[in-house]
């Protein structure tokens, strides 16, 4: 029997040996997908709409190979897709994109997204409902706060995906896990919006809640909201990605921290039908293919570069630098 194998974060390895009767699946996780921008800058020459135009393959073209070849890709969809509408927030940024931007996800290989975040209602309840419907029509489930979806990959793995905010209650999550299992879910994933913006280290509340979610039956907890990377922590039979930062982020043309990552997690299904987590591959990346201006095209860093190693340090929980003092390879 092959037990759970967790490699050091510095190892981006493949080729795990399979025991007889085992199947191995690969799930990819990314951070914030903000396919649009604030209306105050939407008409600028370097804004997301201006850069993308109708080339919907452009934003994810440097990373699509990872997503199109895996079994399932998941992320946090932060913003609204709709034509027109009125901003309902009095302060802060409001993110909106063209309804046609669902093609960015489908062409780029993104399969499931969470809509549980602080920008899903930037244009009110109607904006959220419109976004949900557009994603459904495109075949990309958008999961609402405290709701779940059991999705089956083309390769036959049934994954229960739960969308949460920081107020999540472990008892409620445990009940949702049981419901997903009754619907056939073999693996349970929680996509949760939590933490402190621009903090490289999870709060005590995050750590306590993340572990409670694993105790409640979740295999993988994937966090968003801080906009920067935070550590990965193995806990029991599960794993917590505290924050995967921005990924394809149309909300900021000049982000102070451009580091991001793709996490590819292997899942092992044994002959008796039980599943466990296998090898984990880290793909350190930048939110842009150039600097200092964000061109909204996430791009892997050259292996072994200063930026590549900095991402690994952040995911190991050892980073304490200033985002404005970081260097990039382009």
Put a short name on every predicted segment.
Residues 14-330:
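Acidic, metal/ion-coordinating pockets
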């Amino acid at each position: 029997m092959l037990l759970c194998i967790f490699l050091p974060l510095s190892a981006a390895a493949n080729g795990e040996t399979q025991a007889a009767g085992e199947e191995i699946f690969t799930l990819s996780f990314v951070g914030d997908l903000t396919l649009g921008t604030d209306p105050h800058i939407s008409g600028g020459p370097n804004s997301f709409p201006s850069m993308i135009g109708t080339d919907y393959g452009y934003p994810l073209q440097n990373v699509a190979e990872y997503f199109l070849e895996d079994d399932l890709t998941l992320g946090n969809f932060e913003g609204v897709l709709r034509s027109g509408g009125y901003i309902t927030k009095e302060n802060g940024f409001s993110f909106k994109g063209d309804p046609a931007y669902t093609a960015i996800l489908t062409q780029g290989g993104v399969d499931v997204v969470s809509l549980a975040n602080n920008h899903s209602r930037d244009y009110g309840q109607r904006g959220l409902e419109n976004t949900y419907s557009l994603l459904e029509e495109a075949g990309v489930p958008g999961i609402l706060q405290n709701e779940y979806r059991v999705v089956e990959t083309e390769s036959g793995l049934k994954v229960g995906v739960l969308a949460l905010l920081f107020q999540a209650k472990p008892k409620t999550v445990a009940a949702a896990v049981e419901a997903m299992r009754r619907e056939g879910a073999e693996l349970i994933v929680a996509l949760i919006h939590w933490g402190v913006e621009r903090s490289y280290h999870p709060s005590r509340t995050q750590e306590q809640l993340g572990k409670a979610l694993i105790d409640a039956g979740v295999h993988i907890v994937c966090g968003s909201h801080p906009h920067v990377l935070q550590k990965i922590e193995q806990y029991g039979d599960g794993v917590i990605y505290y924050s995967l930062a921005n990924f394809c982020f149309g909300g900021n043309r000049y982000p102070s921290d451009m580091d991001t990552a793709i996490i590819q997690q292997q899942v092992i299904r044994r002959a008796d039908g039980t599943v466990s987590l296998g090898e984990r591959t880290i793909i350190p990346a930048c939110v842009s293919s150039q600097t200092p201006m964000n061109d909204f095209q996430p791009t892997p860093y050259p292996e072994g570069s200063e930026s590549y190693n900095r991402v690994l340090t952040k995911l190991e929980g050892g980073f304490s630098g200033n985002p404005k003092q970081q260097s990039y390879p382009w």
